[in-house]
Structure formats: structure tokens, C-alpha cells
Amino acid sequence: MIKKTQINESLLLYCIIYLCSFNFWDTKFGMVFKYFFFCVILIGLIGYGKRLLVNKGKIQTTAKGSVILYMFCIELFLIQVINVENSSQRNLAFYQYVFFMMMIPSILYLLEYCEIRKILNVFKTIGVVLSIFAIYEVFSGSYIIQNEYLGIMYNGSRVIRAMVFSGSFLTFGTIMAMISVVSFYDFYTNTSKLNLICLIINVVGLLMSSSRGPLVAFVISAIVIYVYIGGRVNLLKVFKVILIMFIIGMLLAILGITLSRNNSTIAFYLNRLQSIFDWSENSASNTGRIDCWLYSIEKFKDKTNWIFGIGPAATGARAKANWGGFVTESGLFKRFLELGAVVAVVYYMFFFSTVHAGLRKARKEGNQYIALALGIVICILIEDTILQITEELSVTFLLWMFICILLRKEKQNDERI
């Protein structure tokens, strides 16, 4: 007989492995693995629905408000999606809003019978593998999966940013930021040599993406985890962490400056790190992002846009390329601009009420992963505020997976089928 634990863990691990390397599977094997991912989500939905029937529709008391808001969100999203005239935009809108919401109960069901420690260990291992490939891409100057991106000319040399199997260095950077948060949590709670090695390798992988937002989000999340686990928030602890990171940063900067004299790749990556603090006209990428934010705000204030929005999936890279949209460079602005203030507020009420319900349940039951889940949520909220990263399937799935770890029903009797 096969245990449900084995089935659920296998299906969830498949989802994680696929989403962390989807560009490899989709490029080499077509849409087969993506369709199977959709099937897994369907299996999870059926399983969750079956459990509701068995329990006669009873839900956790702490999550009742979230469930009501969830159903309301789905209804509002469907109304807006149906009203989109362009069929391609309508399909993308359904995918980004309705399907992404449908994943949540499916993830919750798959997590019910899983060993969380095993899931996290696999997640970290994936990060180590991706980091090794990322180092290869950066210093070899070639991508493992060929794409249209040719890199950046810096000091007369072509420099590339690692994306490995994620199709984008932005998505890769965000995935590596989440993996680095998990690695930091594991090292802080168990300072073994293996956990230290995993942390170092995964942070290096994050650096190879040259994505500044995920790096900043990781550092802030690490501080939150450190302070949360350490007990009461006090300035001395925060100062200690900042001081340690500053010293490490200075040592890396000195090493980088020394090595960059004859290496354009290292010089480029060092320049990217320095530009985190440069929001003047000297930094084209930062000022360009600010311009996108200001334009989004102006569009939001136009006529009735702030009430009804300009329509789901009206912004983003695919919208810009296919139906005259533009990029907001912010998931926060994206939702308010596309959905309007009312629907966007309802969505964020659902999101934060779900996180709050998860934290309450986790504290009550002594869930050991509260700090980790909180760190991941903060990491993605920061990144999604400065980049519309949650329109990526992999990022949204992983974010909700960590939130659902707080909400999941603890394993009792292991059913067999």
C-alpha cells in the first residue's frame, strides 16, 4: 500500500523542482511537465474539496475571515477577467489572478501529509545546484539554456547575469533569495558546517543574478528572523547584525576591488552592488524604475482608473509586447492600477488576514517555522513592491507554500491508498 505522505510529498516536490527550473523542462520537453504541474494543482483542489465534504464544510475558526475574503476575491477577479475584451489578455488575466488563487487550497492540501524538514532540505539542495550552474554561467559568459539576452557591455567586455533555468535573472534572483532565507534560518537554528556551506553557496548564487532587490530583501528577512528567534526586538541585536553584515560587506568590497582591476565581470557585479545606494541620475536603472512608478501613479489617478482599474493583465512585459501595455515595476502598483482601489484593497485584506491567521494558529500550536515563513513573506513583499515579481508562477507558488506551512493541518494518522 502507498502512504498518502509519499504521494503528497512527491507531488509537492515535483512542483518545487519544476518551478525552480521550468525553463529547462519547457525548452527541452515542450509543455508536458507544465501540463503535469497543472494536473497536480487539480489533484490538490479535488483533495481539498473532498476533505471539506468529509468535514461537512467545517473550516478552522482562525481562517473563517480569510475564506470569506478568498471567495470574494475569486468572484471579483472573475468579473474583471470576463470584462476583458482582448482574448489573449483575458487568458493571461485568468492565469495571473484566478488560477494563482486556485493554487492556494491545493498547496494547503498537499502540505497536510508532508514532512516540512524534507521539503526544506530539497529546496536548499536545489539552490546549491542552481548556484553552481549560476557561477558557471557568469564566469564562462554563456547561458546553459540559450536565449535572446546577449548581456551587457561593461568596460569593453560582455557580462551576463545568471538566470540558469528560470528564464529571467529577476525570477532567478527572487527564487535564490527565498532559498537563501531558508538556508539562513537553518544555519541560525542549527549552526552545523553543512548548513553554513549551503548558506554561503546559495548567497553566492543569489549574487550571480546581480539582482539588487532580492539581495536587499534577503538581508532584511535575515535580520527579521534573527531578531524574532532571538526574542524581544532590541536595538543592540539589530546593530550587531548590521555591524557583522557591514564588516563582511567591506571585506567583500575590498576583495572585489582588488580582483576587478583585471576582470570586467567582477567589476560589473561590484558596480551593481554599489548602485543599490545610488538613486541619483547616475544610475539609469534606478531612475528608470522611479519613472515607471511615477507614470503608474499618474495613470492610476486618471478619470475612473482608481476605482475600476484599467483591467487585469494590462501591465507587465507580456502586455507591453502584445497589447500595448506598460511595465509598472511594482506588484503593488500593478494590482491597484489593473484592479482599481476597491478590488486591490480586498485582495490585500485577504492576503494579510491569511498571514495573520497562519501566525495565530502557528503560535498556538508551537509551529517551529513561524520565523521562516515570516521571513519569506517579508522578502517577497519587499521585492514585489519594487518589481512586479509575483506575476511569475514560481514566485507566487513558493510564497503561498510558506504561508500555508503556518496554516496546514498537522499530520495525524497516515492514510494509505
Language model segments and positions:
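A conserved mid-to-late transmembrane alpha helix and its immediate loop/hinge
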Residues: 159, 203, 312, 322-358
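Alpha-helical transmembrane segments of multi-pass inner-membrane proteins
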Residues: 120-145, 167-228
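Long extracytoplasmic/lumenal interhelical loops at the membrane interface
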Residues: 144-151, 278-339
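N-terminal signal-anchor transmembrane segment
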Residues: 1-53, 75-82, 380
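Flexible juxtamembrane loops connecting transmembrane helices in multi-pass membrane enzymes
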Residues: 241, 254-291, 317-320
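Aromatic-anchored transmembrane helix interface
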Residues: 65-74, 86-111, 122, 127
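Transmembrane alpha-helices of multi-pass inner-membrane enzymes
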Residues: 11-16, 181, 372-384, 388-417
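Hydrophobic transmembrane alpha-helices and their immediate junctions
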Residues: 61, 192-194, 227-232, 338-381
